[in-house]
Amino acid sequence: MKYTGTLIAVTDMEKSKTFYHDVLGLKVTADFGANVTLDGSVVLQTMETWKELIQSNEITLHNCASELYFEESDMDAFLSHLQNCGVSYVHPPLEHSWGQRAVRFYDPDHHIIEVGEDITMVVKRFAARNMTAVQIAKRMDVPEDFVRKCLTE
């Protein structure tokens, strides 16, 4: 078996395609009208056809039990870009206890999107502050071998 992507139901396909392109830079790789695949194997499905596929008229949006997760190597540039996108935030940008910066916001149908700083960039950011691999591993609560691997990438 092979995992091939995540499908989310959307109420307005054109609005969603525009959002995912303009905010996250995702391009359409396949467009079948009611079903659209974007870069990264994110699949958009119209709400009407999703109801048919799952044989239910009860669809719950505004659910905070899952998210689409992306990583960004230039977090400062992305956060600057995001300020001009008019998104509704789950929370403002923050730094997790392990040092990774992240932001969560909603798509047009209130699906949660997280954009986190690429973990290799977190390691390199700490290294730029003259932290040793041992110090970085302790700060991030990760194995020292992981830190050393990140530093060579």
PLM regions with names:
Residues M13, A65-I112, R129, M140-D145, ...:
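Vicinal oxygen chelate
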Residues K2-V10, T37, V42-M47, H81-L82:
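Compact recognition or signaling/catalytic modules
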Residues K27-H62, I112-E117:
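Conserved short beta-strand elements that form part of the metal-binding/catalytic scaffold
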Residues D12-K27:
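Amphipathic alpha-helical segments
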Residues M1-E14, S66-L68, D118-E153:
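N-terminal beta-strand motif that seeds the catalytic metal site of vicinal oxygen chelate
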Residues G25-A30, Y89-P92:
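Short secondary-structure junctions
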